[in-house]
Amino acid sequence: MVKRFGRFCAAGLWACLVLATGAALWTTCAYAADGELADRVVVHKSEHKLYLYSGEHLMGVYRVALGLSPVGQKERERDFRTPEGHYFLARRNTRSDYFLAIQVSYPNKQDEVRAHKKGWAPGGSIMIHGFPNSPHHPSAYYESNDWTDGCIALSNSDMVEVWMRTQDNIPIDIYP
């Protein structure tokens, strides 16, 4: 009897999670169904904000977390800085260690030249992503601190919206 009740509760919890996630994705899909997709992403590191634009129309503003050393240009692998410059959204990853991930085309040619002049590897795998799938801290930590290795992180709900409102190969400009 207890085993059956436990399985019933687990199945019920799973169903609730699926329905809640499905409802959130459906709402976002309905939101994006108006046909308006962003054609440009802008990040202002000093503001901890990501902006989505369609032409000159501001579509959304999202709070972001950055690398553990958020001030300054990324110069090399493992410096925990978020890059600054002109890049593109390169590809999407649903199997990331984080809730959804969109790769940023860092390093660009200037980044590579700058790093190699100093004898460093420029690093890579800069992503826009949600919170970790296996978190080590409460959500409040990820919401209020810079915690990434250099990536741009959003809450999971904001990540769904950014995912649905963008396409690959659109520009992303990251400013100090």
Predicted regions and their residues:
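Bacterial N-terminal signal peptides
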Residues: 11-24
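Short Gly/aromatic-enriched secondary-structure transition segments
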Residues: 57-69
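N-terminal post-signal-peptidase region of extra-cytosolic proteins
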Residues: 31-39, 46, 66-91, 109-114, ...
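N-terminal secretory signal peptides that target proteins for export/translocation
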Residues: 1-7
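Exported/periplasmic cell-wall-interacting domains
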Residues: 36-37, 91-176
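Well-ordered beta-strand positions in beta-sheet-rich domains
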Residues: 40, 61-63, 86, 125, ...
